[in-house]
Every structure is written in structure tokens, then in C-alpha cells.
């Protein structure tokens, strides 16, 4: 095992990055993502590691905010943070060789080799996060005065490599980390093939326009945002003496497993066509997006599998989805914008009697239409009002979701299916990633993972083992969704 810090290939001077209001309000937690590569035969692990380090250094030159230290704003009375950069900025990077990981994988999953993991569709959810991610010890987190914007780990297994990324959500949303990955892949490919990283250049200004997401309207009341609350205690760190760099963990005593399902391009087309015909107005079929159609299917069938309609304590179920506002702002933000721009969530609430009505194309259309309407209502005005709500609160961390997710009836979706992560070319012995997994465990969140080269995508769902058994036996759900792990 080797621990190093990968610095920018072109050093920076001292710089403080002022965060936007949406960055300040964002979750203060590390988001975790896993990429799996199949290594070419006789790949040289040392050469692979060297290429990854060189590529990362060049990528950080282009996207430097991920090399930052997340620190409190001096003297702030509102729990505000900022990013600090300097000549020594970099990303803690752990390199784990094959013999150090194989026995742990054999214990916690289906095997210790790439072939064994691939055979069972990469059941990495059962592997403890500390084995696959470069994590700071709890003792350091409790007393930290600053935290890395990104930590990375590359672990070699027989025939493959598992990349674990943990980034502080204050730095950026998932689209931002995908921008970093795109740059990292490009420069790694160049180094592996040509022995050079070229001439990486600093990020263009539009990708760092955080200042545009400040100064919302005044006197916005929380009642303007259903299913949000002002709660100073909800996110407060467990230790009163700790700087608010990380939120209080949102935990539950209920035991949930994470299952992975695959929607092929053919299945997505079939599902969309079925819903479109059921919703047809005259001779014109309604064209739901894949995200809307899968959201409706998951919302209904996961609720049925969880027997929510039999729980007298709940009458309604909330569906919430994180929205990328880059293209909804005027003028639009650059695709490569680094920062958080996905609040407020799109939200729609329906009676459980309707959500859990027997599944049919018509009943799914009702849910898909509600999801579409909620997403369509999210515009720049709504985002600006949310910024005003946060800025008008006593602390930037006071605004929080008022959701009742697992074991409650509410469902939150993080939809990354539009990202090109699985189609990025890393070159050399790596090629394209063959698998991506969320390593995060946000309570009650369903993850729609990036689309693969064939046009399908995987979905990760949380439920109990008994609920999972019912979902596997659900012929209407498995008509479109293939159980993976």
C-alpha cells in the first residue's frame, strides 16, 4: 500500500474560493463513487498507477477546486465554508496492490478476482467502504479544522482495478466530479500512450462562476417550499466543539440492503412506449423520458414491495428528484461548471392508495406525469427563491429537507443517467470503465447510475431483504428491470 498526495502539475499561488449559497447549503458529507476497470492481460500495475497519478495532476490543473481544503470562513456566524488552495494543494491518493485486497474481497463479496466479481455483476455494496475508499480516521474527522475536497484510492485485483472517489459535497455536485473524471481520463490516456500529459490549462472562468449563485430575493418564507424545513439542529455535528465541516449522520435503526437492477436500452424503449401509448392524446403518443418512466416504475413497485399501502401510519408518499439547473439558468451555466446547482429538489406528493394501486400502464402514467410536472416546474425563479431562503436564515445549514425516507414512505432519486462516465476512454491498460457503483448510503435514496455504451443504465435501490424478495418476484417490475446484485 502506498499513500501519496497528487499535486497540480502546474502549481497554484495562494487562493481562496468563495462558495455560492447553494454550495453552503449543500450536504456536508463525502459522496462516494466506484469505477471498475478490466485491466489488459499482463498489465503493469506500476505503470497504471504512474499514469493515473500523472493524469490526475493534469486534471487538477484544469479543475483545481477538487484539490482544495474545505475550511470555515474566519469569523462567520452563519456556519459558512470556503475552499483554500495553494502551492501544496493536492489530492490524497492511496494505491492498494492485489495481495492487500484479495482476501478481504473474498470474505465480503463473491470473490477476489475481476472475473469472479464480474460473474456476479460486481456486488460491491457488501464490501466495507473503508476497504475501497481512502477515508480519514474518525478521530481526525472529529477535530478537523479543514478537510480535503477529494480523496482517491486505486485498488488492483487480479485482472482489474477498482477506483474509489470520495469528494466533499460542498465542492461540487456529481456533474462536477464527472467533469474532473473526463479530464483525468483524457490526460491518463495521453500519458499511457504518448508519455506526456500535454499542456493542461487552468479552468475557463465560466466553469468557476460560483458568484452567480448568490444574492437571492429577500423575505422568502419556508412555506414557499413544501417538504423543506428550517431546523438549526438537524445537521449540527455530534460534537459541539467540532467545526461544521460535516453534517450529523442521518441514520435509522431499520436495516436496508442495496440492490442493483439493470434497465437495458430495449427495456427502456419498451417501457417508454408502453406508457406513451397509455397516455396517448388522440393519435399522438406522449414521449416520457427514460428518467420519468423509470422513476414512475420504481416509485410504484418499490412501494408495493415494501407494503406501504398496508402501513396505516402513512397516507401519502413524496417523490423527490435532484435537478441539474445548469441549463435552466439564464444565461445557462457551462456544462463543465464546478459547484452545486441542484437545489431545490423537484417534489410531488401523492396518496399511497394511488401510488400502490395495482400496476398498469395507466397507473404508471399518472405517476410519470406527476414526476414530469414536478421536474418541469423547477426553473431559475424557483432556484433564486431557494437561494433567498438560505441567505435569509440564521445559518446556511438551517434549511433542510423535511422528508420521511426509509423506513418511511418517501423516495428520493439521484439521477446520474445522463452522465458519460462509462463512455470515457482512459487508454493504455484501462480502456473504458466497465462498471460504476455508488458507495454512498444516503437514507432512502435511489441512484440512477450513468448510462453504459449500449444505452442502458443501472439503478441502485434500498429496501429490506424481505422487500427485495417481493421485488424479485414482481413480474411486472422484472419485465423491464434485470436483477444484478
From Swiss-Prot:
Pathway where it operates: Secondary metabolite biosynthesis
Protein name from the UniProt record: Acyltransferase cm3D
Organism: Cordyceps militaris (strain CM01) (Caterpillar fungus)
Recorded superkingdom: Eukaryota
Cysteine pairs bridged by disulfides in the record: none
Complex formation: Monomer.
Enzyme class: transferase
Enzyme Commission (EC) number: 2.3.1.-
